Amino acid sequence: MSEKRAGKVVSVTDIGSNFVRMGVYQAGKGGVQRLDYLEVPLRLGHEVFATGRISVSTVRQLSSILRGYAQVMKEYGVTEYRAIATTAMREAKNRAYVLDQLRIQNNLVVEVLEDGEESSLVYSALCRSPLLREESLLSYVGTGSVGLAVWRQGAVDLSCNLTIGFLKLSEMLRGQEELTARFYRVLEEYVENYFQRVALRLDGQTFSRILLSGRQLDSIAALCGGREEKGALVVERRQLEEMYALLKGMNASTVAREMQLSEEVADQIAPMLAIYRRMLDITQAKKLVAPPVNLMEILAAQLLLPAEKAAFEQAQRAGADAAHAERVRSVSVFLFGKLKKLHGINAKRLVLLECAALLHELGHRANVKDEAQAAYDLIKSSYIYGLDDEETMLVAE
């Protein structure tokens, strides 16, 4: 049995399309420290994308997995948790029934992340990469959805979400794999149709690189002969094109055998490459850059790290005067305490005040002539750990 730890211990459970994962975390000197990690395969995505529903037997399996995780949470002395579900649960026609069963059987409240929220969490992590440029295309490629966003002048300038992903594509084309030429032709047509909206919205904009996060990127980088740069995996466009051309002559069974991949990964590798290939084509980007991004650790940070710390880090990244921002924050906290009998505002509002103090100079580099408006625009479109949309707007205002 694991020993209970000193300090706050939290857990994050992720009910995904292929696996049910749980991590146990604690705040450490370098940020979030993972104490334990569990992963059990469960093919929710295959079931939902094929039938539209989650079967009763699968709900039982899921409930059993979560009971085991609850025991681990108890052993570690977890005091706060967050349980999320993504694309498969989001698209299940009977998701309300499934969530209700988990609440009754497991006493667990599961939050279904919508497309935009899932993408925003990933973008917040991608924006911390040292490989981010002044103007970059950010992307999140999931099992059933793809998110894209343009990062410009310290904020997300344009974003869109597509209801397509590599697992969903794989399920849609199941049965075509043996007809190799037809399979790839239909695959490319599907991907091109879904990305038409992206091409129209980008309106000819080009980028030198795409910063992205997604499943199996380590497998793709290894297959394509990618390299590591500043902690990120980098795949050149030429490498990806060469690998895609090689795969076009193989079916999934041959790919698994020749590339020494599992059958599951071999099934999904062609849709993955087709999506990345289309993104590179639309943007004329020369490379894919995949910094280490972990959605569960991002959510754990929300539970463990104070929002004002995240705001301070964001201000530093934007080039604000950190010492000045800290002085403004200190004065704000002092005045808040002295005037508490008059204003009667709660402690949560103090956190928002600290965030506003730390971020008030955020717009200086973006627009010297109208710093206030620039700061407002940057903050309202940002994601700050620990704050919801309404609280972020209050900070911006």
Predicted regions and their residues:
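Beta-strand initiation motifs
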Residues: 30-35, 155-157
